[in-house]
């Protein structure tokens, strides 16, 4: 049974928001106060909302759902791709292409083209082409891979998306809202929580805070797979093995301060 402690969030710097002048008034109910001109997020609320978000992710995956991690900001790029691979899910960590969800058929066409180029590399087709032709195909493939490599094995639209910066990923959020795809997201003091189905108030800039949030989401995916009796594809780990960061943070916060049990 997972635990989510205030201490764990505190040690990750989860409580630091943005400068008070940059806030979104809709976040008022999630703000504890201000210190030196910076909003402090109410971690008593964050820990409960994190638990609720994790439970939703777990239940969705247990029911056979798929998850799309979205994080294109510099601090999140590696975290998002690593967690998606660890859990056998999907990710977008470069620029979000408009229509990735709402124009799925067109995106599928680009993915098919990427797979065609990949196949040509291994079946000997490249050997029959000129150097210029192979270079053109390589460039084309690299461009598509950079944009869509994290979803090239996603056969259908995801059942939920997990977002680490709702301002930067506003197009992804809007597309998900339009299609009725639930959104789980980390929302900082300058964000609008209203379009988010499961908002988790917290710092969306600090590496430790991002690591904690993304790792908790990934652990919930794995828990859902465990409960469904499914193996975790392409992860290289056994079901139930949590991330190193999540394990260390959990140990640091265990038994201290208030905790919420799932």
Swiss-Prot record:
SUPFAM superfamilies: Ribosomal protein S2. One of its GO terms (biological process) is translation. This is Small ribosomal subunit protein uS2. Gene3D superfamilies: Glucose-6-phosphate isomerase like protein, domain 1, Helix hairpin bin. GO terms for cellular component: cytosolic small ribosomal subunit. PANTHER family: 30S RIBOSOMAL PROTEIN S2 PROKARYOTIC AND ORGANELLAR, SMALL RIBOSOMAL SUBUNIT PROTEIN US2M. The gene is rpsB. It comes from the Bacteria. Keywords: Ribonucleoprotein, Ribosomal protein. Residues 234-262 are annotated as: Disordered. Signal peptide: none annotated. The keyword Ribonucleoprotein applies. Belongs to the universal ribosomal protein uS2 family. One of its GO terms (molecular function) is structural constituent of ribosome. PROSITE patterns: RIBOSOMAL_S2_2 (PS00963). InterPro entries: Ribosomal_uS2 (IPR001865), Ribosomal_uS2_bac/mit/plastid (IPR005706), Ribosomal_uS2_CS (IPR018130), Ribosomal_uS2_flav_dom_sf (IPR023591). It holds the Pfam family Ribosomal_S2.
């Amino acid at each position: 049974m997972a635990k989510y402690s205030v201490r764990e969030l505190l040690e990750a710097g989860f409580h630091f928001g943005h400068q008070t002048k940059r806030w979104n008034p809709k976040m008022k109910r999630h703000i504890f106060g201000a210190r030196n001109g910076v909003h402090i997020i109410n971690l008593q609320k964050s820990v409960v909302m994190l638990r609720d978000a994790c439970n939703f992710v777990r239940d969705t995956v247990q029911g056979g759902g798929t998850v799309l991690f979205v994080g294109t900001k510099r601090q999140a790029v590696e975290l998002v791709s690593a967690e998606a691979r660890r859990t056998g899910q999907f990710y977008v960590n470069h620029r979000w292409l408009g229509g990735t969800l709402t124009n799925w058929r067109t995106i599928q066409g680009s993915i098919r083209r990427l797979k065609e180029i990949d196949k040509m590399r291994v079946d000997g087709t490249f050997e029959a082409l000129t150097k210029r032709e192979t270079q053109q195909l390589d460039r084309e493939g690299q461009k598509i891979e950079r944009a869509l490599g994290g979803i090239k094995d996603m056969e259908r639209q995801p059942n939920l998306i997990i977002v680490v910066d709702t301002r930067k990923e506003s197009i992804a959020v809007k597309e998900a809202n339009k299609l009725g795809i639930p959104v789980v997201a980390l929302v900082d003091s300058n964000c609008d929580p209203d379009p988010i189905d499961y908002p988790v108030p917290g710092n969306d800039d600090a590496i430790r805070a991002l690591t904690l949030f993304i790792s908790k989401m990934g652990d919930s995916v794995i828990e859902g797979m465990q409960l469904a009796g499914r193996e975790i594809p392409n992860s290289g780990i056994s079901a139930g093995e949590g991330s190193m960061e999540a394990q260390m943070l959990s140990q640091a916060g265990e038994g201290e301060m208030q905790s919420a049990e799932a």
